[in-house]
């Protein structure tokens, strides 16, 4: 009888432990793989974000070194088979070949087509990449005796406003934003277990971001900053900034949407002479934001990670 009681106690303890693990499994982990721009900046790879929720590992945009950054993050790359593109600018897609092809190399972890979502042109992009790497793909397939050949193909889907993916309790919604033209740029909302994350993508001030981000747990928003004198003296800088959300505008978005935590990624800073890769410009940008927004906001850094549960916690 005593042994039976002890066994029952151990079972209860084990079940409690499993409950705690399941609660932990109910969170969303967000890792900023790249927070930069097209500029060559060793401190900031170009834009990419990794979302881990339950059994899903989803990448949003694949900037420079996205796959290497994903490896550094400690994510389960065996589950990385889905890439969502906000738009088709080079700094958001330049890492696709690495993400796509590395999944087939030994030790290979993908035997099914690589799934890709994006705006108009995404199917042409996938077809072009497949053609560009056709010689390499053929050699790899022969090396592995024809096994997993499907893993070298793309399954590309053009997105529109609305749900674009749903599996294992994870929902991904795309919403159009204004960056450089109509129907060419999107943001994403990711929902899982009652938690939510919004990625603005590259955008100017857009009411659609506000619509989808109201009350969100974590809002990852891009920002573009140049001093007034730079905008006045350099037309190129002014045109570039016209495609991005200014600090005061982002502060307004944060004020209206009231996320539990706001984070900056894809941080564009210019002086009148050109790109400013120093921290000085970033600090000035943050000062402008804090003039009108006093809520929690973080200047994102590469490989910074957040856990979205009952609260939003910065992990590193």
Regions found by a protein language model. Name each.
Residues 35, 86, 203-204, 265:
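Ser/Thr-centric signal marking residues that sit
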Residues 1-6:
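Positively charged n-region of N-terminal signal peptides that target proteins for export
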Residues 23-197, 277, 284-313:
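Binuclear metal-dependent hydrolase catalytic cores
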Residues 186-187, 196-198, 204-304:
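Cap/insert and terminal regions of metallo-dependent hydrolase folds
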